[in-house]
Every structure is written in structure tokens, then in C-alpha cells.
């Protein structure tokens, strides 16, 4: 998908109205160029992604390996930050000149498939140029829409709860798999009452967390062509959240804004925060406490509603080199050396070849790998919620309107009506 407990993602979504899953944070650009063929049979393909300098460095090292194995395929690169990437891509797609292969997220699959931008990679899979073997926990299905394979995952992530372990230990709280929302909210109140610290930094605007809550209760944020919940559902969610903000159990939204670009969790202005598991390396870098990953609360003591989301590689329906693009994607998701180079930069490595090849040595990444392995072993992973065209705009609206509601600038009832109005427009476009 692709923001959410992550300060960077909140900022990006407000600026761009864009989605998910994972993102790079520094605004940098590489060189672009036209794809084509030369007289000696060498083919050039264009590859674009969003990310920071560190991601660019890793990807360029991976491309060097690919070009060594496939000397007749050259790769021209282009990268920006998340906002600039999607602005440029939208212009390129509208002009009929998108890159041959590009980084993508689930929130954009139906949107650009609807516009005829994405190549169905099944033909290249059937031709033997691209393999769907050895993907972890069925994550390859994230890239499937209406029987078409529109994206190939490069990494996976799932929602998690990051906690300040020292605060939770002092409060005598030990979250375990299957704990309930009632237990979670009781824990937040206990932390507030005993340590004068908000228990959570603001869960109520995270679309992907609310989706898990809805899934636990037989619904979902989206259906294939619309919203999967009603105004009464959201009114209850936001009313409860507003009351907790007023009671001091949730961090004051104004404080959250002041803490940026830091997280209010790592700034010691909250004791927990929901975010994607692969984002959690930031807390140890930013904060002075120790941070851990706790299970998602449940409604029934069993099901968390979780699924694996993913960054993926997609191809242009207009590419003149579908075979070479498929070979490139295949190399980038299956080659063990690429896995060692990329690490968890784009999520937990999606294929077993790469997952087994990369062994993190730092504690935060070891914890992320263990968390995702434990979630899979717990048997709680389901199929990802459908993301209709316009899902990215809905996510941005949900975050923005929830922020206004939590600060009291918009009443809950008005905020709910505003969200449903904006979502209806976005999903109809």
C-alpha cells in the first residue's frame, strides 16, 4: 500500500495524496533517457523508482550485476522522492511514454491498469522469462488484479505495533499474540495514569490499521469498486479516538506536528505507534529508548486481519522490450546477490532465494525478520484487501481529515461526511 505511524509517510501523503507501502525520503534525481535498440543488438530499457540516495546506491550495484550477466541489455535509471516520482510518472503515462519498468505499489495497480498503462506479465511468465516460484507466504498475489499479473513483489511488509519497551515494562504490560483492543486501550490508559505519558501517538488516521480492524469485524476498507464500510463504522472509530485524544491517552496532534520529522514515539511523547514493520529501523536511530515490535490487537482474540503488502516492479504496456524487461525483473527478485545488496530497504525480501541469502546483523532488522516470520507462523495472514482505482487519494484524505478531526477543527460528524464525499469522488474518477 505503501503511509501510518510513520512521520515521513504522513508528510508525503499530505503533500501528494499518494499511497503506500514503503517509501524513500530524500529528494534526489537520477538521469532518464529513451529506451531502444542499437545496431549491435544491445537493448536499453528505462527503470524508474522512488527512494533516497542509499536505495539508489543499492539498486545501481544490482543493475551492474544484471548488466554483467546480460551484456546486451542496458538499464537507464531515473529516481526521485515519492512525491516527485508519481507526479512525473503521471505525466509520462498520460503522454504515452512511461518507463519500461518501474517501482509500484498496490494502491496504484487498478488505477493504472484502468488506463491501459500496465503490462500483464503473465505472457512473459508463460514464456519462461519470469518466474513466480519461491515467493514467501503467497506475496506474489499482491500484484494480481482480475487474473492479471501487474506487479512482481520485491519485498513484503505488514502492519505492526512499535512499543517503547522500557515504558511498557515499567507499566507491567507484556503484549502477546491474540491480545484484544480492549486490552490495548486499557494498556494505553495505564501508561497515561502511571507515567503521565500518552500511550499511543495517533492510530486513528492510519488507513491500513483501520482496514485491519474492519477485517477483524467482517468488513474491509475497500471492496473491488468502493468502500467496504459505512458512516456509522467510521463515526464510532473517530469518536472513540477523539475522546482518547482529549483525555491525554493519545499524543496531542499539535505535539505530533511539532516533533516532525521525528516520530513522537522516538521523541518520548508517546509509548507506542502503529506502522509498517520495515519502517521500524528509524526508531532506534531517532530515539534513546529501546523499541520492540508487538502484535496487532484483535477483536476476537485470534484474527489480526493482517496481510503482506509489498513494493513491486511493474512494466509498461507500451514497452518495446517485454522479454528484456521480464528478464530484468526476474533477476532483481530472484538473484541471491541482489538480495544481499538490497537487504530490507524495500521490505522483507520477497523470494526465498533472496530472503535466505541475506542475514541481517543489526538488531532492528533481525527483529523485523523475526516479527514477519512469527506473524506468518501464527496463521493470521490473509489475502490483501482490494485497492480500487482512487485508493491512493482515499488514503491521503483519510489521514488529512482524521488530523483535522483530532485537533477539533472539524467535528467528528462533519469529518465523516467529508471523508465519504471525497472518497466517492476519488473512486468514481
Predicted regions and their residues:
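Conserved N-terminal structural module of periplasmic/extracytoplasmic solute-binding proteins
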Residues: 2-111, 126-132, 300-301, 321-324, ...
